[in-house]
């Protein structure tokens, strides 16, 4: 980020302000393009962890917002949305891990989600291979760069906040399976369901846990449909889960990525 400050000759305050405007502005536009109701969508964005993350991971937060904006364009039928996805990859290399998942989510168009058990099992198998396979760890290091890849050699958990988030994602995917959705939106919900696998990996490797945020970014797009179906009790449980995770993020952010298990 220091390079950008020198190139554009911006003060730190102005640079932070412009970055925040771009990050949140693109997220807002993506939500506006897809969600028929803004209040629940913006509320979900504010308390799902995405908003707080940008205070700690500014560059990746911008990449996520560009990625989500591109996804929204693609869902609206605009092929040049792929340009934004590639741009996001240029800004932060973690996007390269997520791109194949989005491409996969464009298949099986009649399904709201992928099979939960298969996704969880795939995440567990990938984590096991990553922990025992030097070749796979080396490949990911080359993909995301030495700055982040060096963390793959370390056995780092992501705290109890990640367990709560995994439970929240499981609940959302379970609710999605019984929710009527527009055909164009099913790609986003299938993509979100693949985030379960990323979160399983993130339970043990904090650096890959941040990849989960790309999947979480699609939640504001479809949350109003979750709230339009099911009982009031289901809606209350959903919001309680989201708000609980938000307060853990807000009051004890260090417990989300302390590089050790806090349950022990």
Over which residues does each language-model region extend?
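Signature aromatic-anchored transmembrane alpha helix within multi-pass, membrane-resident enzymes
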Residues: 117-125, 231-250
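Transmembrane helix irregularities
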Residues: 74, 89-92, 201
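Short acidic/glycine- and proline-prone juxtamembrane loop motifs at membrane-interface regions
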Residues: 55-61
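Short hydrophobic/aromatic helix or loop-helix immediately within or flanking a transmembrane segment
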Residues: 1-10
């Amino acid at each position: 980020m220091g390079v950008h400050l020198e190139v554009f000759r911006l003060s730190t305050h102005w640079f932070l302000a412009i970055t925040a405007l771009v990050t949140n502005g693109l997220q807002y536009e993506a939500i506006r393009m897809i969600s028929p109701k803004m209040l629940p969508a913006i509320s979900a964005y504010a308390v799902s962890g995405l908003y707080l993350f940008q205070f700690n991971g500014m560059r990746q937060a911008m990449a996520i917002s560009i990625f989500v904006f591109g996804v929204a364009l693609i869902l609206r039928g605009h092929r040049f949305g792929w340009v934004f996805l590639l741009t996001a990859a240029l800004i932060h290399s973690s996007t390269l891990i997520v791109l194949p998942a989005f491409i996969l989510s464009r298949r099986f168009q009649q399904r709201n989600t992928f099979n939960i058990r298969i996704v969880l099992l795939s995440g567990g198998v990938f984590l096991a291979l990553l922990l025992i396979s030097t070749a796979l760890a080396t490949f990911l290091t080359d993909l995301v760069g030495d700055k982040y890849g060096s963390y793959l050699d370390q056995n780092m958990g992501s705290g109890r906040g990640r367990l709560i988030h995994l439970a929240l994602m499981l609940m959302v995917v379970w609710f999605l399976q019984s929710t009527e959705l527009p055909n164009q939106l099913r790609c986003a919900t299938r993509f979100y369901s693949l985030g379960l696998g990323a979160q399983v990996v993130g339970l043990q490797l904090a650096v890959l846990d941040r990849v989960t945020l790309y999947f979480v970014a699609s939640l504001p797009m479809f949350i109003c449909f979750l709230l339009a179906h099911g009982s009031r009790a289901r809606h209350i449980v959903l919001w309680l889960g989201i708000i609980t995770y938000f307060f853990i993020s807000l009051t004890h952010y260090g417990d989300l990525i302390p590089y050790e298990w806090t349950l022990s």
